[in-house]
């Protein structure tokens, strides 16, 4: 019975998010790192606030909803290619990457300019 439930959940997530490829995996990884970075920065600044933490989770859920919308658009318009979903993933990867670098910078870590520029270029495409 548990196997059937797990299989149904896998099928449902595959339908909602499309193929589990590199852009989607990088986006999810970046969102987790950004969320954890926000928590670390808030702890260092002694301004840890559960309301802000919940807003971070709401932001992640909202991004995932946008990904689902882009997958459904691809299913409707592109019939098997992930154009909208990949574009959306790249956009949010750039946003999350910039946020991660900003979080590290707040902790006093120097940032490679080329990496920041590449993320900004990706965001503006």
From Swiss-Prot:
Segments passing through the bilayer: 22-44, 54-73
A GO cellular component annotation in the UniProt record: plasma membrane
Keywords, in A-Z order: Cell membrane, Membrane, Transmembrane, Transmembrane helix
Chief localization: membrane
Entries under Pfam families matching the protein: Phage_holin_4_1
Keyword Cell cycle appears in the UniProt entry: no
Superkingdom, taxonomy of origin: Bacteria
Transferase as UniProt keyword: no
Membrane topology, record value: Multi-pass membrane protein
Subcellular location: Cell membrane
NCBIfam families: holin_tox_secr
Family assignment from sequence similarity: Belongs to the bacteriophage holin family. Cp-1 holin subfamily.
Protein name (Swiss-Prot/TrEMBL): Uncharacterized protein CA_C1842
Organism of provenance: Clostridium acetobutylicum (strain ATCC 824 / DSM 792 / JCM 1419 / IAM 19013 / LMG 5710 / NBRC 13948 / NRRL B-527 / VKM B-1787 / 2291 / W)
Organism lineage: Bacteria, Bacillati, Bacillota, Clostridia, Eubacteriales
């Amino acid at each position: 019975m548990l196997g059937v439930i797990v299989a149904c959940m896998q099928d449902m997530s595959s339908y909602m998010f499309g193929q589990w490829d590199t852009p989607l995996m990088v986006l999810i990884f970046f969102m987790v790192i950004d969320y954890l970075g926000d928590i670390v920065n808030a702890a260092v600044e002694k301004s840890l606030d559960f309301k802000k933490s919940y807003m971070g989770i709401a932001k992640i859920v909202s991004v995932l909803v946008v990904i689902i919308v882009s997958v459904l658009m691809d299913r409707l318009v592109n019939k098997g290619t992930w154009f909208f979903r990949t574009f959306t993933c790249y956009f949010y990867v750039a946003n999350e990457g910039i946020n991660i670098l900003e979080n590290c910078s707040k902790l006093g870590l120097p940032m490679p300019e080329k990496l920041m520029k590449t993320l900004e270029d990706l965001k503006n495409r």
